[in-house]
């Protein structure tokens, strides 16, 4: 987001925080003198604050020693957390957690191999049941601040790899019973949004949900296909694809410290020290996720060779 900002930002006053009026005037001045209508629109998009979201930018060192930047956004009103980063190979990963519906969406935008006949990129989405204890709440996330934003972070705990075998496609135009965020986030993955039967059954236990409405939003994979894409020679044959991604750093829990508070007895003649617990930090984790799912052509899974 910030890469387009400098040309607009140079027209802002160098000292102090500009008001919304000053921001509008600065962008208008830029538009008037450069006749750059697109830049005028971009200025407004970049400089209009969103008071409902809180964002952290985290520098994370991956296992290969490379540093990537994660963007973690918390929306308390929607009870959402969105984590996004770009891998060194250009793959863009977006993780959205919908706490209200206990849904986690992982979206992967993978750059295509044009020399092998692929389009510029392809998008896949995986919707799974989210366990609330796996990530701190949106409210707690919104309260986090960095003392040293340029520090390179490494997680305290490696949670290893979790494997998911997907069983159905999601029909995005019917996906509201799962979460309303699927259709917007995964709009480019119309034929490549996946879910598991076991998660449908778990969501059906939530208040206001039903297995019939959830199943109506999905289409099962063809039966009796067990051939992995790395075992198939034809680029046009169906197969089971595997995609793995790792979240290198995320807040997976809160830390509590013990303190002492002074309290009185009922008579008020004695005071005693009592142990109390208070929040004093976060626990950070790393986790990899491997998805196995059906593709209609091996051409859609060239990385799994």
UniProtKB/Swiss-Prot annotation:
Stored InterPro entries: Oaf, Oaf_C, OAF_N
Entry keyword annotation includes Transferase: no
Alphabetized Pfam families for the sequence: OAF_C, OAF_N
Alphabetically ordered keywords of this record: Developmental protein
Family note: Belongs to the OAF family.
Role according to the record: Vital for proper neuronal development and hatching.
Name of protein: Out at first protein
